[in-house]
């Protein structure tokens, strides 16, 4: 759409470069590290062994072509979303008396240094917003242009319908799952424990669920979500790489991808987060330019689709 819709190939090339690099942060190393940390915290396994297993499974899918693994992951993800949703609700309801306090905390600290999870005490409003935007972008990828890569591969007679389906991902991910997680952390009070990331979420779930169920649900969810993200982002990154270099060197990208899954499971993430934030922003810039300049086409196609639904000329279930 940047090359053919706008006639600006240079924008498409910029997007392809930044997209192929951003994938190694948001979709590879951070995901692998999250999964490894969850398993280490829950089962006491080493990050080396977890990273090795994750890299082998990834290689079997993207290099070996064993699609059954990715098929199982794609089936398992909705199931795990439902379990995580129910688990988070139970945690919140078990601390219902503190829910109001938790919501108040979220709003009170939204524009203070505390919003940066204690690591940036005294941070300015600009810094807080910067980290909020960066983490929001990481959470739902809105505006990055990653989702259209997957949507473009979908078989549909109505592009507007596919766009609306893609939009639902942001709603489910951010407004539902992330909101429930935030409320669980705030209402249980574990946010002041000093833990971060998946270990903090484990504490919250363990505070509201019996036995080891909390740690089990968070661990399984983290591994499932991380692995599916690794596979999805390999596809995004590969398509960006292919646009710029052609399909001759795609196999090299896949080998490097698998290597970084293993490396990412063991590295300290501060540098990776900084790299990821920068690449995510750079990837979003050409995409947002395209969205603004092609907004007329967007509105026209959406309006035509909605009118077709109303007058019956388009079957919304087709």
What are these regions (language model features)?
Residues 1-6, 191-209, 235-244, 304-310:
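Flexible loop linkers connecting adjacent transmembrane helices
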Residues 3-61, 220-230, 263:
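Helix-loop-helix module between adjacent transmembrane segments
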Residues 4-16, 51, 156-172, 247-255:
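Membrane-interface alpha-helices at helix entry/exit sites of multi-pass transporters
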Residues 8-22, 52, 115-139, 176-184, ...:
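Select transmembrane alpha-helical segments in multipass membrane proteins
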Residues 33-39, 45-107, 241, 273-299:
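Membrane-interface loop-to-helix entry segments
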Residues 87-105, 113, 117-120, 153-156, ...:
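Extracellular/periplasmic helix-exit of transmembrane alpha-helices
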Residues 127, 249-303, 314-318:
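A generic transmembrane alpha-helix motif of multi-pass inner-membrane proteins
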Residues 136-141, 145-159, 166-167:
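Helix-loop junctions at the membrane interface of multi-pass solute transporters
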């Amino acid at each position: 759409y940047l090359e053919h819709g706008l006639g600006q190939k240079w924008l498409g090339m910029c997007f392809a470069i930044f997209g192929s690099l951003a994938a190694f942060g948001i979709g590879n190393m951070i995901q692998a590290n999250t999964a490894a940390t969850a398993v280490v915290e829950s089962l006491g396994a080493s990050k080396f062994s977890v990273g090795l297993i994750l890299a082998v499974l990834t290689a079997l899918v993207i290099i070996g072509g064993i699609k059954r693994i990715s098929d199982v992951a794609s089936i398992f993800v909705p199931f795990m979303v439902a379990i995580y949703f129910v688990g988070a609700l139970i945690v919140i309801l078990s601390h219902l008396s503190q829910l109001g306090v938790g919501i108040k905390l979220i709003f009170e600290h939204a524009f203070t240094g505390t919003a940066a999870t204690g690591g940036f005490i005294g941070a300015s409003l600009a810094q807080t917003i910067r980290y909020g935007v960066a983490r929001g972008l990481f959470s739902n990828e809105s505006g990055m242009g990653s989702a259209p890569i997957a949507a473009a591969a979908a078989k549909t007679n109505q592009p507007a319908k596919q766009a609306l389906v893609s939009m639902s991902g942001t709603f489910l991910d951010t407004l539902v799952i992330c909101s429930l997680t935030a409320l669980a952390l705030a209402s249980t009070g574990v946010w002041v424990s000093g833990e971060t990331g998946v270990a903090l979420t484990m504490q919250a779930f363990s505070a509201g669920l019996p036995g080891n169920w909390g740690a089990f649900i968070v661990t399984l969810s983290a591994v499932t979500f991380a692995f599916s993200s690794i596979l999805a982002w390999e596809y995004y990154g590969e398509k960006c790489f292919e646009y710029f270099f052609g399909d001759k060197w795609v196999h090299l990208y896949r080998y490097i991808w698998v290597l970084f899954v293993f490396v990412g499971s063991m590295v300290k993430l501060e540098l990776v987060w900084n790299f990821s934030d920068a690449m995510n922003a750079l990837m979003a810039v050409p995409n947002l330019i395209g969205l603004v300049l092609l907004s007329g086409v967007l509105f026209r196609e959406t309006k035509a689709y909605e009118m077709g639904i109303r007058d019956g000329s388009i079957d919304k279930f087709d």
